[in-house]
Amino acid sequence: MSQQETHGFQTEVKQLLHLMIHSLYSNKEIFLRELVSNAADAADKLRYLALTNDALYEGDGELRVRISADKDKGTVTIEDNGVGMTRDGVIEHLGTIAKSGTAEFFKNLSGEASKDSQLIGQFGVGFYSAFIVAKKVTVRTRAAGHKADEAVLWESEGEGSFTVETITKASRGTEITLHLRDEEKEFADDWRLRSIITKYSDHISVPVEMWQEGTPERDGPDGEKIPATEGYWKVMNKATALWMRNKSEISDEEYQEFYKHISHDYTDALLWSHNRVEGKQEYTNLLYIPSKAPWDLWNRDRKHGLKLFVQRVFIMDDAEQFMPSYLRFVQGLIDSNDLPLNVSREILQDNHITKAMRTGITKRVLGMLEKLAKDDAEKYQQFWAEFGQVLKEGPAEDFANRERIAGLLRFASTHTGSAAPTVSLDDYISRMKEGQTKIYYIVADSYDAAANSPHLELLRKKGIEVLLMSERIDEWLINHLTEYKEKQLHSVTRGELELGELEDAAEKEAQEKLAEESAPLIERIKAALGTKVADVKVTSRLTDTPACVVTGEGEMSTQMIKLMQAAGQPVPEVKPTFEVNPAHPLVSRLNDLQDETAFADWSNLLLQQAQLSEKGSLADPSAFIKLMNQMLLANMK
């Protein structure tokens, strides 16, 4: 036996242990679900490794998990004969959290137990859940294929450190013993443990066993002798792959527990789909839409994808090749009959079978969401609030399904008068005015900025609905979604307003007349502003505001410029088109000014006001304030 070594826990582990004990106390029994789930994973991993090295079974290929309790000692032991761990593996897996984005996770914690317990659940506590009920945890483990004297003993009281030493262990696998706190001794009871296993672990494909005591010989009711029975390890769960069972035999509770097993989520899934596909490719998929977004959904390093099985043998986690990135929130598994057992991520990458399965699974998920949107709008809004921004990546990523994805998108709109994104493109089309051929939208920094934009004035007056977009991804989305059901999406802040048949002949004639009469004013403003603008025009979109700026048809929008600047990208200089409203009193007064210096100052002030309204900021706010103060002083004399 080697000398004992003491190691300090990683800082994040200390924080997690403290939080778990204080935040997960209301659902203590989940410790058993987590530890049994880990044990089943260890069995799956050994089964996979043994495909290429049968010697790892060491003559014992019957994989299982065994649970036992000792009331007198106040202990619970979970033992598996799976893959086991080496000394380095123990230090790595039981002393650190090897996850990207860990620091970000701890920033998200609020100190409110109910919210934090949900976050911790999403993070996946796994092994550390043992400390919810245990004052001390002892782990004895030996990696498959290693010598008996290369086993490891790990021990900790869940405070600041743990000890590790080399021991001898005849059998491979891992044995975890929980020394229960005095107030948690209820878990050292066979019946209590059986009820938890039935509740949480029925779906696990590895047998979960508990010791069934034998009975002595006894007399029957008619005096006959009933022979003694020997004690044995009794299987407590169904121990068959849930996804291979008939759908009609699986309860909603079983589906939900299986979801929690594969996702390590503590909340129920929003919906799921269980299907067997036959034909050119044969595979089974079980797909879940979570009810809550994971805390690290936007972390670029976050692993995502489905669990991959081949002929019921677990192959890998996070097989992202079967799911496009914009559906990365989907959890579940795929079990293929066509892929080879020695399949690797590299083989999956350019495999025609993989591509066909990916196409089928993508359509399946989109179908699930379409059905949800149609059958339960309220539940769909719940989905949208969690994952809508990710789904908006779809039109850029998946050209083949662009129209279907577009039908699932939701936006705020001038029709509802609410910031809630509840309007679909189909809703919009159903309310289009007679003669309307375009879907009008605006992208701004916030809902209020979009809803109150002067660019909407004429459209509001005519009762034409405008979609209000204010998420960072909206500008990216709209660059890849230019039409829907043969209706062009048209920005109200870019180029001409293009009302087409919505503008009658009299209005058009009046607009042309106004432009003609205002031509001298427009030329004066152009001269005053010089190179600050690309052009100056009489507006066709304003009714109550003196002026606005618009982007040219082929130029980069204000929102796209902001996105690129935020990402540190070089941005080309874009000069706006300045539109003025000659019917507004300010512009009318401007036309009467004879002093060209004063005229230039007022023209600049109107331009900067319009830019402030459009961008929310100015390149040189000090110059704007100085000019405004100067104008105020001049008019107070």
Swiss-Prot record:
InterPro entries xref list: HATPase_C_sf (IPR036890), Heat_shock_protein_90_CS (IPR019805), HSP90_C (IPR037196), Hsp90_fam (IPR001404), Hsp90_N (IPR020575), Ribosomal_Su5_D2-typ_SF (IPR020568)
Residue runs in coiled coils: none
Record bears the keyword Lipid metabolism: no
Region called B, residue ranges: 346-562
UniProt region (A), positions on chain: 1-345
Keyword hit for Membrane: no
Cellular component, GO, one term: cytoplasm
Cited function: Molecular chaperone. Has ATPase activity.
HAMAP family: HSP90 (MF_00505)
Protein name from the UniProt record: Chaperone protein HtpG
Species in which this protein is naturally found: Shewanella putrefaciens (strain CN-32 / ATCC BAA-453)
